[in-house]
Amino acid sequence: MIRLYIQCLILWIIILPLLAAREGFGGRCLKPKDKGNRSCGRSQKYYYFNAEKGRCYRFTYYGCKGNSNRFKKKSDCVSSCACQAVLDHGSHCKSKAKRKEGSKVRYYFDSESGLCRKFWYVGCGGNHNKFTSKTSCKKVCVKDAPKRSKSSKPTSKTFSKNAQYSMNSLLRMLKNLSKKVM
């Protein structure tokens, strides 16, 4: 058990900084919220992705510096980052009214396969990788996915997308494993 923990920790220490430095491999979404500073420009409302919660939140950007985890529109934040969030079925609601509604069919974007898949949403919480229809999931998350026929060869863009999905999955796995071990 300790050996597995050490191996995961080493992978985590090596891979996370590399990924955070690379915009194309989820680095933008892994960065913390950074409001910038007030030394220039005027403040504006933006959205950032909270990687811990898998959700996009609104914040005030002060106009200078900051980092790239900043989106003008919530839909851009969701399609760039939340579509990569791991499936979260939600939790049972404390409110009696919500509990009576029961579980609902929802769709999430599976970044491994690049497809929108059905799941049962319990009713409260969860993250932004949750859509009321397969169509809305595709519209937000699949719109930029490369389309190719079965006979065509993978392009560098396809390879990059698949590598991103694999790296995001590895990150999620390491993060979940490190939580269980600690």
Swiss-Prot record:
UniProt xrefs under Gene3D superfamilies: Pancreatic trypsin inhibitor Kunitz domain (4.10.410.10)
Principal subcellular localization: secreted
GO molecular function terms noted in the UniProt entry: serine-type endopeptidase inhibitor activity
Domain BPTI/Kunitz inhibitor: 29-81, 83-141
Location of this chain's protein in the cell: Secreted
A cellular component term, taken from the record's GO annotations: extracellular space
PROSITE patterns to which the protein is assigned, alphabetical: BPTI_KUNITZ_1, BPTI_KUNITZ_2
Tissue: Nacreous layer of shell (at protein level). Expressed primarily in the mantle with highest level in the mantle pallium and lower level in the mantle edge.
Keywords: Repeat, Secreted, Signal
Leader sequence residues: 1-20
InterPro entries: Kunitz_BPTI, Kunitz_BPTI_sf, Prtase_inh_Kunz-CS, TFPI/VKTCI-like
PANTHER family registered for this protein in UniProt: BPTI_KUNITZ INHIBITOR DOMAIN-CONTAINING PROTEIN, KUNITZ-TYPE PROTEASE INHIBITOR-RELATED
Protein name (Swiss-Prot/TrEMBL): BPTI/Kunitz domain-containing protein 5
Classification lineage: Eukaryota, Metazoa, Spiralia, Lophotrochozoa, Mollusca
